Structure formats: C-alpha cells, structure tokens
C-alpha cells in the first residue's frame, strides 16, 4: 500500500499547480508554505543582491510601473541582441521609486492594508504568491500593483536596494526580541543599523516600531533617541485617538502578530521616530 505523500511533496505539488495556472486568483494557503518567524541574519543565505540600487530589477516586482514593458519584446529578440549596461538598467527600471519598506514582513498583513490607503506609493514586503493573487482579483481597478516583496538580509544589504533619502516610511513590526544578551547583536535596531535607516530615509520620514516585549521596546527607544539623525514623534502621533497617524493605526491592527497579541490580551508598545534634517557643513 503506497505511503501518503510527504509534506514537502504536497507543498511542491501545490506551488507547481499555482505556477502552471497563471489565471488562478485564489489566495495561497499558508499550510503549504514554510514560513519561519525569524531568520538568522548572520547566515550566508543563497540570495542574489544588486550591486547598487541602479542595478535592482524593480520592474519584475512592479510590472505595472515598468519603464519598458517586457512583453513588448519577444524572447528571441532578447537572446539574439546583447544589451549594453544602460539598456539592461532600463529594462529593470520603474517609473517611480519605492517609498515604504516593511522590514520583516511576515505574511504581509501590514503591506496589504497599507496598499489601498497609499495607492500611488510603491511598497516592499508566503507573500509573493498573495501579491499575484490579489492583483488578479483586482485587475479591473489595478489594485495592489504598488505592493511587492523580496527576501533579503536588511542588516547587510539595505543600501544595495535603496538610494539616499529614497524612503518615506520604514516599518519594524514585532521584530525578533533575541532575549539572550549574546544575541542582542542580531536585533534589527542598533546604533549602526540606525545610521543605515537614516541614510535611506528622507528628512521628515518616519521609522515605525511596534512590539509586545517591553525590554525590546525600551532597547529600540534608547538606540533611536541616542542617534542624532532621529527624534521621537509626538505622543499624539503614536497613541490611539483622532490625531494618531494612519500608519500607526494600521500597524497596530493589521499585522498577523498584532492580531495575535490582541486575541491574547497582550500589550503593544509603539514608538515612532522622525528623520531630522542633516546639519549644514561648516
């Protein structure tokens, strides 16, 4: 009597079926995806990174915003005609820059809630298949064309993707607390990393943080407040009420981890930090 297919085989069969039927607009099922809550930032994962933001293939993530529509070229043309570096960059380019980054996006709940609220803003965050499905479901109104995701090590390669002062918002939602002191170096907030966030964030842009771990909250607040490029946002900006920022409201309620904390009656600690103008050179 044959054995039942292994979980891995079931996952592969499910994913292959999705890829074969490009018109299938059903949302992907989480049970067929291995989603680790956290990844080791010090491991050398088999990932490809652009040499610089100019070499990043944004057109494949946001085809609706591509400078050159790839379907206009046949595969034969691309293979028979070698492209110079400038032409290759044009094929990868999009008509506007990504402005919102959710670092550590989980299942993408935050980004999918933000996308309709900021329809003209490109955002980056199991999720890529969900992006494809939502685009198909909303093809008539072109919704979710502004949302996408990629897997990358932010702690090592953030400036490879984003140029100076490109982003307007960075979200750090329920990051790994790394409780042990010897693991604190792996936390997504540190004085060194804050300098990288300051580099890619435009003056007036905001870093949003939320966690259910008070110790981590105090750590993030302490490190951002010590950094000369950031200042704490007003309490009204962070706290629930009429003056609360729209991004804070979505961050509190729309992430999967945030929903779980609400179900369990846990605390949510929010802190937001605004990028200040750089001082003039003497």
Swiss-Prot record:
GO terms for molecular function: tRNA (guanine(46)-N7)-methyltransferase activity; tRNA binding. GO terms for biological process: RNA (guanine-N7)-methylation; tRNA methylation. Keywords: Methyltransferase, Nucleus, RNA-binding, S-adenosyl-L-methionine, Transferase, tRNA processing, tRNA-binding. InterPro entries: SAM-dependent_MTases_sf, Trm8_euk, tRNA_(Gua-N-7)_MeTrfase_Trmb. Residues 10-22 have a biased composition (Basic and acidic residues). S-adenosyl-L-methionine binds at residues 104, 153-154, 173, 255-257. Its EC number is 2.1.1.33. It is an enzyme of class 2 (transferase). One of its GO terms (cellular component) is tRNA methyltransferase complex. Its main location: nucleus. The active site is at residue 176. Catalyzes the formation of N(7)-methylguanine at position 46 (m7G46) in tRNA. Forms a complex with TRM82. NCBIfam families: tRNA (guanosine(46)-N7)-methyltransferase TrmB. HAMAP family: tRNA_methyltr_TrmB_euk. This is tRNA (guanine-N(7)-)-methyltransferase. The lineage of its organism: Eukaryota, Fungi, Dikarya, Ascomycota, Pezizomycotina.
């Amino acid at each position: 009597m044959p054995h039942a297919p292994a979980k891995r085989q079931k996952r592969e069969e499910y994913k292959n079926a999705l890829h074969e039927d490009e018109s299938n607009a059903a949302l992907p099922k989480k049970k067929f995806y291995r989603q680790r809550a956290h990844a080791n930032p010090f491991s050398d994962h088999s990932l490809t990174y652009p040499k610089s933001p100019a070499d990043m293939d944004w057109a494949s993530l946001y085809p609706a915003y591509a400078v050159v529509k790839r379907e206009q070229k046949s595969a034969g043309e691309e293979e028979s005609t070698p492209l110079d570096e400038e032409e290759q960059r044009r094929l990868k380019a999009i008509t506007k820059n990504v402005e919102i980054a959710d670092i550590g996006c989980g299942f993408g709940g935050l980004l999918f809630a933000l996308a309709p609220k900021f329809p003209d803003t490109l955002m980056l965050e199991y999720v890529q298949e969900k992006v494809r499905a939502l685009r198909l479901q909303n093809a008539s109104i072109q919704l979710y064309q502004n949302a996408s995701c990629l897997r990358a090590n932010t702690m090592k390669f953030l400036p490879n993707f984003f140029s100076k002062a490109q982003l307007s918002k960075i979200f750090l939602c329920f990051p790994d607390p790394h409780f042990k002191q010897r693991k604190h170096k792996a936390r997504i907030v540190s004085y060194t990393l804050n300098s990288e966030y300051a580099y890619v964030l435009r003056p007036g842009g905001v870093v949003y943080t939320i966690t259910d771990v008070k110790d981590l909250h105090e750590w993030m607040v302490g490190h951002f407040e010590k950094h000369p490029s950031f200042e704490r946002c007003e309490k009204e900006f962070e706290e629930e009420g009429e003056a609360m920022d729209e991004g804070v409201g979505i961050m509190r309620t729309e992430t999967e981890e945030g929903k779980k904390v609400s179900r369990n009656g846990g605390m949510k600690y929010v802190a937001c930090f605004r990028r200040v103008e750089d001082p003039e050179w003497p």
